Amino acid sequence: MRLIIKGAVALFLLLAISIPLSAQYIVQGVVTDSLTREPLSYVSVRLKNTTEGTTTGSDGRFYFKTHRSEGVLVISTVGYNEYSRLIHPARNLSYKVALSPATYALNEVLVKPKREHYRKKDNPAVEFVRRMIEHRDDHSPNEKDFWQRDRYEKTTFALNNFDEEKQKKWLYRKFDFLTEYVDTSAVTGKPILTVSARELLATDYYRKSPHSEKQWVKGRKQAGVDEFLSKQGMQAAINEVFKDVDIYENNISLFTNKFVSPLSRIGTGFYKYYLMDTLQIGGETCADLAFTPFNSESFGFNGHLYVTLDSTYFVKRAVLNFPKKINLNFVDYMLLEQEFKRAEDGTRLLDHESITVEFKLTEGQDGIFARRVADYSCYSFLPTEEADKAFTKPERIIEETEALSRPETFWAENRPQAAISQQENSVDRLMAQLRGYPVYYWTEKVLSILFTGYIPTSKEAPLFYIGPMNATISGNTLEGPRIRAGGMTTAWLNPHLFGKGYIAYGFKDERLKGLAEVEYSFKKKKEYANEFPIHSLKVRYESDVNQYGQNYLYTSKDNVFLALKREKDDRIGYYRQTEMTYTNEFYSGFSFQLTARRRTDESSYLIPFLRKDGEAYSPVKDFSTSAAELKLRYAPNEKFFQTQWNRFPVSLDAPVFTLSHTIAGKGVLGSDYTYNHTEAGIQKRFWFSAFGYTDIILKAGKVWDKVPFPLLIMPNANLSYTIQPESYSLMNAMEFMNDEYFSWDVTYFLNGGVVQSYPIVEKTEMEGNSFLSWTLWAFE
């Protein structure tokens, strides 16, 4: 889910928010063709060894801000000679630059690329790319029956541009030892302070038929300011943001979006290609193939592919970055680099990959520097016993028991030489020193409560969590002010047996409510009861208020932020419920749930129950149902952010199919009514490459018997001022009740394809990820 990714990024950005802005200067001017004197659009203008810069507009003009009083201005574009000069932005000058066209020779073909007159017809670069696309699978390792490789991966987050001037700011003066941990980025050359580091050592396995991909994790290490967050949840979110990249696919997944690959089947209609020059890489002569999207706001890349000049069209190196005008939330800069080598039989092997990102929350802040580096080695195409063992496991990622507790000697022996950085590998020491200061210690505690909602009873391996804290104080029309206290046990108390509960009290109705739950897990858990996969038996008793027509998917009804309503909430009664549930989840994505439930719905002065006897109505205090329920769910390749109490999807690419049926018989175990209720649903995200994506949710349901209104189907109304998925913000609670329905929710995200074309969006830097949404609830 995109809100989860943004929240994780915002955690790191919070560290940089309070840094005062330094003096800023303006760099502006115009770029023209030296021969025609026509303005040149989409020209790269930047300060050397920094990410500060911009691209020229349609009139050739450029404008950007910098806090540097001196620097080297570099202006470059495809088909022209690069221009550079020393400038002093503090002097507030306007620069007029005329670029001279460049001429390149390649295979005795003369290419003079001119951006203003780009043509696909009879273009040697386009023909070159078409031949590359035709042969892109010829030497793919996935054409082999089997392969395996060792992987070392390191992901770091750092405060960006942590220079001497920033170190003097009041926020950091208390922590003068931070200078000991300042490093220099090998990509941007900026001083950075690493505040989070993650390392992974694993072996990847691939089998063509039957198709299977596994990863055997031998070591995993984490240290930094994000330690208080769910380890599994953060790892899932980071894996979704920094996915493995295959430039030979039609689409490249990064930052929960999909971008058109330069080697996509539709590449020649999406990109402009240029043959720039020839050069030697690893002893082989390669062509420098440059590319840029026709539309600089579209979800694609600028970059270079270095391709061997032989019949294999082998890519030795790839360099990709985002167009400057792309609007991608907090992402201000991105650089993706890949290096390939050949096996003895010519198979293409990925040797090294790095993704460098600069995140910014607001202009004027240096933000966060993030980098993921992966080194691959020890490729083999012969199956091994270890591989056979991995393929017998149901899970895709197999983690060794001691993977999280490897000693430092293990990492020192297994880190590649290029990954050895004293500052990056000293985050443990940095965090220990920071926590020695009360101001940081308590700030971290507060952030932990805000992000997780729970208070652990101990720093290491807590036996019990108190919370959720956002439900401690709330209120509604029936109860008036309401207080609640609760918590849950963890796997550190018992890895199989878990308890959860709360007690709540309303000062207006003066009634005590509560929940008591005991769950036995047949699988040993690491931290929480709801870790995937769940295989458990749970007994639960709950007595509380029932807010009819308000059932939220990802938050508690007691959330304090839901207490403020746009409409008077006077559709509230009471209920008591006892249930026993058996749940079994499988790695295939299939799960089922069997529940036996006894429920009593009780009226209140806000929701009276009346029974019609002839022409007269008599009040009914309550009614009961004894029901059995079966739920089936299938969500292959589903990925989610795991928290202490819930799961939030981090990707909607996987389809989700659901089917459930509830049955109750009048007179059976004291049930007052016969009740049959069937629900079915499907949801899926569909990607249209360069044309965005659409999210589709289809649901249908039917109550097959004549029942009182609390047992009917009520559309989910959202009376709060928050955004809640699959709820109706313009509908009131119990405004509609029905015994059958069909609903569809379709949202089409254009990825800036239309809205960002308007000048007002470009000039105001508004969010350009336009979308269209349709929602329908058909009922009877």
What are these regions (language model features)?
Residues Y25-V27, S34-N49, R68:
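Short, ordered, surface-exposed loop/turn motifs in non-cytosolic proteins
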Residues V27-D33, G60, V97:
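A short, amphipathic beta-strand motif
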Residues V43-L47, L73, V111, L320, ...:
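Hydrophobic beta-strand segments
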Residues L47-N49, V72-R85:
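A short, solvent-exposed loop/turn motif at the edges and junctions
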Residues T51-R61:
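Short, acidic Ser/Thr/Gly-rich low-complexity loop/linker segments typical of extracellular
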Residues H88-K114:
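Extracellular beta-sheet/turn segments enriched in Thr/Pro/Gly and aliphatic residues
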Residues Y104, L110, K114-C286, T292-G300, ...:
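Structured extracytoplasmic
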Residues N257-F259, F391-E780:
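Exposed, low-structure sequence patches enriched in small/polar residues
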